[in-house]
Amino acid sequence: MSSLSVNTALAGGLTAGGLVAGASLANAPPSPMLESYYGTYQACSPMPSPLLLPSADDGRALEPLSPLGSDNEGDSRRRSRRARFHDAEDITTQLAQALKSSHRPDTSPLIEILPSLTHEQVMELRAEYKRLVKTGPERKGVNLAKHIRARLKDEDPLLMKASYSVALGRWESEAYWANFWYQGDKTRRELLIESLMGRTNGEIRLIKEAFTDKKYDNSLIKCMKEELKEDKFKKAVLMVLDERRMEEYDHYGRLQPIDYGLVDQDVADLRRAVRSEKGGETAMITIIVQRSDSHLRAILQEYERQFRANFARDALKKSGNLVGELLAHILNGVINRPVRDALLLHHAISASRKDGLRRELLISRLVRYHWDPDHMRAVKQAYRERYNRGLSDAVREATSGEWGMFCEELCIARTPPDVRRFDKISYSVR
């Protein structure tokens, strides 16, 4: 095996081995209508009503953040917390030591450290790891995420997926999940839907920039064009990747005014689409995928006011397939994102007990939510209110071993979200 070395005064001679839009949307074949897909939203309990939409500035539904040093949130096992002082060089030394040699890696540092880092800290750690940990006669820097994958893929595949996706960082992990589905069981389209749908144009841009796969010239668009078959689901995905979504804010960061004339037209078009005997998906995709959250929120409220019906449910009834799944994901996020994500976690926890292949859903969802501590806190509160139990307890019961411990760590909404840092200083004694 090749060997790695860490070039740091702290580590000394530490070594580590073991690294080994083509046609138009309207002309797309209507295959999703003919291909039933029993996905997440068809397996979940009813969605919340748009009448319960919280306003953007309504903070009454959220409890204040826990004081530093606690994250008890009602879970049965109280977690003691301590401030983590971030030192990328020290962490690099710990992780390289843990991953070294041909023996089973010491996974404790992975479990204790990786879930606690912000995206920015992960990026800093990856750069430091490549700078300090070298391999081969040419002393090339080692990619931390790839090192984790190489050392754990046979030892503990589930822990590998969880720790590898965190080590990729926020945006590359989404690119990983977006193209993960076609590498194995191609029925796991939720991984693709949840990585891309409902994102801002800026987020989509970051995900595309982070995508790496030489087979597709590091182009996520090329990957989707080649891997997805020609249907309206594919056209919806490419529409998202083309960054065609209405912007929520202007260049000065101000919320864009809602065009209520366009809202009325969209409501009429959507009503016509869900009531038509044939077709209708093209109109639904075009509107739901391309409108901003605030515009969609206005559509849902006006639709319910006019027709006393929940459009999200009507759309899922109309399209019991991939198109219905992607529309439901976007709309549920508009209605109430914390509740939607609590529902998705509950679904993943239940599904992973029955089907080992569905554990990727639980991992991907926990990794996604943990990057935003405030959102994770809101999700945990929504989970408790909806299911009358703590998220950490539910995850602990549904998982096992070290990957389960890693998932529990992802559930911790760390407050404050920024981690303390000590800068190295020098001083002299007179």
Sequence positions of predicted segments:
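Structural signature for extended repeat/solenoid scaffolds and their inter-repeat hinge/linker regions
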Residues: 1-430
